[in-house]
Amino acid sequence: MKLLAPVLWAMAALGVTWLVAVDSKESCTKHSNGCSTPLRLPCQEYFRPACDIHDNCYHCGKTFGISREECDKAFLKDMNTLCKKLGSNSATCPARGKREVTSHRATSIAHSRLWKTALDQKSFLNRKARQVFFLLPTTCQGWAKNYHLAVKLAGANSYSVTTDLETCQGLEHCLPNH
């Protein structure tokens, strides 16, 4: 029994450390809605950690003296860091769903045929679709810039200008530079 006691203490300590790590990671989603957009866009799930930090920054930034501009700059930096993790072999964000992973080539071929068919028609809507289609980024960094631009243009109402120490207490590690 004397030999077993230190092992049990070590296991308990490791278990508590693991639970604290899981709890602190989940606490970072408390004020987050992920990378919320009305459309399903590429990199949404891949950028989720950066979006969680950004959402927390928008909710608790004022409380900890972080401006909206600092939140947005950190958001772009975090997304670019995620993009760099992909390396030079993969310029686009990895797909999350099983179907997306298994049918990557077939999907891109099917999409190109659908777009070609749709864009060959000579209507006003298709001219607009052609303009939008060619503006869409094709790289992870390109999508990071678009997400950053979107929050700069449309995120003003989401940044909390009030301090809320009660709900933000303990979330310092969920903010940029913490």
Curated annotation (Swiss-Prot):
Residues 1-24 form the signal peptide. The modification Pyrrolidone carboxylic acid is found at Q131. Residues 98-130 form a propeptide. Expressed by the venom duct. Its EC number is 3.1.1.4. One of its GO terms (molecular function) is phospholipase A2 activity. One of its GO terms (biological process) is arachidonate secretion. It is found in: Secreted. GO terms for cellular component: extracellular region. It is an enzyme of class 3 (hydrolase). The active site is at H54. Its cofactor is Ca(2+). It comes from the Eukaryota. Keywords: Calcium, Disulfide bond, Hydrolase, Hydroxylation, Pyrrolidone carboxylic acid, Secreted, Signal, Toxin. It catalyses: a 1,2-diacyl-sn-glycero-3-phosphocholine + H2O = a 1-acyl-sn-glycero-3-phosphocholine + a fatty acid + H(+). Its main location: secreted. InterPro entries: PLA2_conodipine-like, PLipase_A2_dom_sf. The modification 4-hydroxyproline is found at P38, P42, P49, P137. The keyword ATP-binding does not apply. Heterodimer of an alpha and a beta chain; probably disulfide-linked. Belongs to the phospholipase A2 family. Group IX subfamily. Catalyzes the calcium-dependent hydrolysis of the 2-acyl groups in 3-sn-phosphoglycerides. This is Conodipine-P3. It comes from Conus purpurascens (Purple cone). The lineage of its organism: Eukaryota, Metazoa, Spiralia, Lophotrochozoa, Mollusca.
